[in-house]
Amino acid sequence: MNKMDRQRIETVGKLGSTYGIRGWLRIYSSTENAESIFDYQPWFLKIKDQWQAIELETWKHHNHELIVKLKNINDRETAQTLANVEIGVDLSVFPALEEGDFYWHDLIGCQVVNLQGYAMGTVSEMMETGSNDVLVVRANAKDAFGKQERLIPFLYEQVVKRVDLTTKTIEVDWDAGF
């Protein structure tokens, strides 16, 4: 396993518990379509806070779950050492997006400001709902409205007016009192 610079790696899933005695592991994908995790190669595993390259040998469906066989992981005991380890891929494997589309990892950490110039906080995570994605904004410590968190729908052009990834700023048409 080769080590990789952590700055360029994005987590796309996690290995779960072992399956069987031949080194198979359950996998939990955080990609929009669970099987899409296999489109992004090579994989890196986060072991002891270091990203290390590993080769996927094969995968399959089993009882509504996905299971994987990693190269050179041939028994249950070795596989067990990888249980609950994060799976990452180099950001360069993600396709370029169209205007107005953004990867969640690019939005997390951005400062959110409304049209009146009020600093609403920092995007701490993204949430998927049935109709649209939602910015989870952790409010600044001395928020004038006493907010700790704001949920702002990510509706580009309607609510989200501008995203500047260079300055890590998102401008929204949203009342600071909400």
Curated annotation (Swiss-Prot):
- Specify the PRC barrel domain's residue ranges: 99-178
List the molecular function annotations (GO) for this entry: ribosome binding
Q: Gene Ontology terms, cellular component aspect?
A: cytoplasm; ribosome
Any Pfam family matching the protein = RimM
Where in the cell does this protein reside? Cytoplasm
Q: Does the keyword Cytoplasm apply?
A: yes
Entry-linked InterPro entries? PRC_barrel-like_sf (IPR011033), PRC_RimM (IPR056792), RimM (IPR011961), RimM_N (IPR002676), RimM_N_sf (IPR036976), Transl_B-barrel_sf (IPR009000)
Q: How does it assemble?
A: Binds ribosomal protein uS19.
Give the family from UniProt: Belongs to the RimM family.
NCBIfam families linked: 16S_RimM (TIGR02273)
Description of its domains: The PRC barrel domain binds ribosomal protein uS19.
Role: An accessory protein needed during the final step in the assembly of 30S ribosomal subunit, possibly for assembly of the head region. Essential for efficient processing of 16S rRNA. May be needed both before and after RbfA during the maturation of 16S rRNA. It has affinity for free ribosomal 30S subunits but not for 70S ribosomes.
Name-wise, this protein is Ribosome maturation factor RimM
Q: Which organism is it from?
A: Mannheimia succiniciproducens (strain KCTC 0769BP / MBEL55E)
Q: Taxonomy-wise, where does this protein's organism fall, top ranks first?
A: Bacteria, Pseudomonadati, Pseudomonadota, Gammaproteobacteria, Pasteurellales
Gene that encodes it:
rimM
